[in-house]
């Protein structure tokens, strides 16, 4: 009987101890809720560790990705601002260039008027030798002179005198009449001689590229200086049929263009 009572007491003591230690463990876990629990690492098929959502390395990787994504956006904004400034600058430059071109065009027209008026005092020869053509006369005077009747009379006279120079182009070699122009050139003041030589050199430079008839009309190439340039090149002396025929075609096309202008 005593033995049973002793065993019962030992059972109660052991049960009380187990309850006490269990309560202490629970209290300890409640006091330290922020203690980090061991992580269960995961690995992929290639042996590379898979980062968890709350892994510090995973967080740093996401932060780097956000930074890398923000950089192109910032660069794009900078490029847009730079493009806007470039557009404003180009518009300003375009307006400035248009103003400069307009001023130069008006200045060139005024200079042409003074030049033609000065040359007309020395006779039609001086004007023709300097590269003035009926098309030049009609274009410049027709746009700027108020007295259209006076312009019409002067233009018709100049045009008639000009194209008479080519009436014998099919019958007589132009080289036979070139000496006349050389003699007339020597009679001019040195300033007009210089102007005439510049005009002739300009035509000779254009002819080196073998332009079409239409291109020469657009450039207002003087048929007289064209003929003089061929003579200087020896085209008439060696009877260069192709070059001479092209000159004839140009004179006809130029006259037709002047009539229609």
UniProtKB/Swiss-Prot annotation:
- Position of motif RxLR-dEER? 49-64
Localization terms from the record: Secreted; Host cell membrane
> Which key words are in the record?
Host cell membrane, Host membrane, Membrane, Secreted, Signal, Virulence
Which segments of the protein form a coiled coil according to its record? none
Q: Which residues form the signal peptide?
A: 1-18
Q: Name one GO cellular component term.
A: host cell plasma membrane
Q: Give the similarity note.
A: Belongs to the RxLR effector family.
Function statement: Secreted effector that completely suppresses the host cell death induced by cell death-inducing proteins.
| Record text about domains | The RxLR-dEER motif acts to carry the protein into the host cell cytoplasm through binding to cell surface phosphatidylinositol-3-phosphate.
The protein in question is named Secreted RxLR effector protein 154
User: What is the species listed in this Swiss-Prot or TrEMBL entry?
Assistant: Plasmopara viticola (Downy mildew of grapevine)
Quick one: which gene encodes this? RXLR154
């Amino acid at each position: 009987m005593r033995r049973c009572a002793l065993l019962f007491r030992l059972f109660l003591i052991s049960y009380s101890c187990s309850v006490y230690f269990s309560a202490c463990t629970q209290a300890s876990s409640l006091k330290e809720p922020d203690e980090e629990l061991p992580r269960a690492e995961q690995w992929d098929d290639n042996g590379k560790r898979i980062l968890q959502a709350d892994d510090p390395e995973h967080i740093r990787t996401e932060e780097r990705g956000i930074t890398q994504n923000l950089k192109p956006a910032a660069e794009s904004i900078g490029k847009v601002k730079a493009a806007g400034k470039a557009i404003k600058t180009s518009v300003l430059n375009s307006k400035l260039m248009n103003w400069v071109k307009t001023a130069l065009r008006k200045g060139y027209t005024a200079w042409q008027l003074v030049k033609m008026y000065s040359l007309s005092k020395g006779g039609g020869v001086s004007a023709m030798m300097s590269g003035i053509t009926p098309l030049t006369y009609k274009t410049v005077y027709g746009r700027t002179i108020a007295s259209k009747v006076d312009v019409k009379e002067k233009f018709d006279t100049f045009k008639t005198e000009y194209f008479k120079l080519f009436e014998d182009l099919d019958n007589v070699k132009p080289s036979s009449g070139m000496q006349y122009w050389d003699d007339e050139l020597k009679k001019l003041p040195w300033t007009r001689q210089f102007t005439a030589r510049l005009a002739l050199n300009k035509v000779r430079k254009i002819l080196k590229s073998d332009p079409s008839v239409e291109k020469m009309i657009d450039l207002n190439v003087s048929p007289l200086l064209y003929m003089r340039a061929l003579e200087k090149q020896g085209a008439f002396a060696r009877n260069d049929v192709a070059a001479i025929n092209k000159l004839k075609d140009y004179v006809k096309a130029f006259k037709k263009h002047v009539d229609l202008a």
